[in-house]
UniProtKB/Swiss-Prot annotation:
PROSITE patterns documented for this protein: RIBOSOMAL_L21 (PS01169)
Domain of life: Bacteria
Protein name: Large ribosomal subunit protein bL21
Species for this entry: Azoarcus sp. (strain BH72)
SUPFAM superfamilies cross-referenced by the UniProt entry: L21p-like
Protein backbone atom coordinates (compact mmCIF):
# COMPACT_ATOMS: atom_id res chain seq x y z
CA UNK A 1 0.00 0.00 0.00
CA UNK A 2 1.24 3.48 -0.82
CA UNK A 3 0.00 7.02 -0.38
CA UNK A 4 0.74 10.50 -1.68
CA UNK A 5 0.91 13.01 1.19
CA UNK A 6 1.34 16.76 1.30
CA UNK A 7 3.50 18.42 3.94
CA UNK A 8 5.56 21.58 3.86
CA UNK A 9 4.08 22.60 0.51
CA UNK A 10 5.48 19.51 -1.23
CA UNK A 11 4.08 16.12 -2.18
CA UNK A 12 5.69 12.78 -1.32
CA UNK A 13 4.89 9.20 -2.35
CA UNK A 14 5.29 7.01 0.75
CA UNK A 15 4.89 3.40 1.78
CA UNK A 16 5.02 1.73 5.19
CA UNK A 17 8.57 1.30 6.50
CA UNK A 18 10.13 4.02 4.33
CA UNK A 19 12.21 6.93 5.61
CA UNK A 20 11.69 10.36 4.03
CA UNK A 21 13.12 13.83 4.59
CA UNK A 22 10.49 16.58 4.70
CA UNK A 23 10.53 20.28 5.51
CA UNK A 24 11.14 20.86 9.22
CA UNK A 25 8.25 19.89 11.52
CA UNK A 26 8.17 21.22 15.11
CA UNK A 27 8.06 17.82 16.86
CA UNK A 28 10.40 16.03 19.26
CA UNK A 29 12.61 13.15 18.13
CA UNK A 30 10.85 9.85 18.81
CA UNK A 31 7.36 11.35 18.85
CA UNK A 32 4.63 10.00 16.59
CA UNK A 33 2.79 12.37 14.26
CA UNK A 34 -0.27 11.92 12.08
CA UNK A 35 -0.42 13.42 8.60
CA UNK A 36 -4.02 13.80 7.44
CA UNK A 37 -3.35 15.59 4.15
CA UNK A 38 -3.46 12.39 2.08
CA UNK A 39 -4.02 13.18 -1.60
CA UNK A 40 -4.09 9.61 -2.93
CA UNK A 41 -4.06 6.04 -1.61
CA UNK A 42 -3.29 3.02 -3.75
CA UNK A 43 -3.01 -0.72 -3.29
CA UNK A 44 -2.47 -2.92 -6.31
CA UNK A 45 -5.06 -1.97 -8.94
CA UNK A 46 -7.38 -0.04 -6.61
CA UNK A 47 -6.63 3.67 -6.28
CA UNK A 48 -8.49 6.32 -4.27
CA UNK A 49 -7.93 9.90 -5.40
CA UNK A 50 -9.05 12.71 -3.11
CA UNK A 51 -10.80 15.95 -4.02
CA UNK A 52 -8.46 17.39 -2.76
CA UNK A 53 -7.84 14.93 0.12
CA UNK A 54 -9.05 11.38 0.74
CA UNK A 55 -11.59 11.52 3.56
CA UNK A 56 -10.74 9.35 6.55
CA UNK A 57 -7.22 8.58 5.35
CA UNK A 58 -4.18 9.23 7.54
CA UNK A 59 -0.49 8.38 7.64
CA UNK A 60 1.25 7.70 10.96
CA UNK A 61 4.95 8.51 11.13
CA UNK A 62 7.68 8.65 13.76
CA UNK A 63 10.22 11.48 13.90
CA UNK A 64 13.68 9.91 13.49
CA UNK A 65 15.89 13.00 13.46
CA UNK A 66 16.26 16.67 12.60
CA UNK A 67 19.06 18.03 10.46
CA UNK A 68 20.22 20.39 7.75
CA UNK A 69 20.71 19.67 4.05
CA UNK A 70 23.97 20.38 2.24
CA UNK A 71 24.76 23.99 1.47
CA UNK A 72 23.37 25.45 -1.74
CA UNK A 73 25.74 28.06 -3.13
CA UNK A 74 24.32 31.16 -4.81
CA UNK A 75 26.62 33.24 -7.00
CA UNK A 76 25.40 36.41 -8.69
CA UNK A 77 27.53 38.32 -11.16
CA UNK A 78 27.14 41.25 -13.55
CA UNK A 79 29.52 40.97 -16.45
CA UNK A 80 31.94 43.83 -17.09
CA UNK A 81 30.76 45.71 -13.96
CA UNK A 82 33.03 44.08 -11.36
CA UNK A 83 29.98 43.00 -9.32
CA UNK A 84 30.04 39.60 -7.64
CA UNK A 85 27.95 38.35 -4.75
CA UNK A 86 28.33 35.04 -2.91
CA UNK A 87 25.62 33.61 -0.71
CA UNK A 88 24.86 30.23 0.82
CA UNK A 89 21.79 28.55 2.26
CA UNK A 90 21.14 25.38 4.27
CA UNK A 91 17.54 24.17 4.59
CA UNK A 92 16.35 22.43 7.78
CA UNK A 93 14.65 19.05 7.47
CA UNK A 94 12.92 16.41 9.58
CA UNK A 95 13.46 12.73 8.83
CA UNK A 96 10.32 10.60 9.25
CA UNK A 97 9.79 6.84 9.30
CA UNK A 98 6.37 5.88 7.92
CA UNK A 99 4.71 3.44 10.31
CA UNK A 100 1.23 2.87 8.90
CA UNK A 101 -1.19 4.05 6.22
CA UNK A 102 -4.90 3.91 6.99
CA UNK A 103 -7.54 4.61 4.38
Amino acid sequence: MYAVIKTGGKQYRVAAGEKIKVEQIPADVGSEITIDQVLMVGEGESVKIGTPVVSGAAVKATVVSHGRHDKVKIFKMRRRKHYQKHQGHRQNYTELRIEAISA
